[in-house]
Amino acid sequence: KIKYTSFWKTLTPFELTPGFERVTRVSIKPENVVAFLQSTEVLEAAMKAAGEDFQLAVFAPIGGGPEGNTLMVRGFAKDGKSMGAMFDKGYAGASWSQAFVAMQSLVDSFERDSIEECEILYTAE
């Protein structure tokens, strides 16, 4: 049963590998959007350089209703254990933690924050 459907424009490169995801909706001042997108790519590269199996992607909503003025940021890990370990490392001062702080500094407000376990569903239609 499909519980949610919508359209999104990918603003940063990523490979669709559903798994355990932190999903946030953020408001960014228009003049900071480019810097924010760049900062997400810097963070992802720093995490991968540190050996993390992680992806970070940013999407703009199409037909997003009341959340149409926000960006969706999805951080992808293979499972909950991996995601939890990354949070522990980040709070302990991992080499990439300053890149995370720099990215967060460009966020004006967090509109929504959740952890989701996602999968791709194929239909016969």
Regions found by a protein language model. Name each.
Residues 1-125:
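Short S/T/G/P-rich N-terminal loop/turn motif that feeds into the first structured element of a domain
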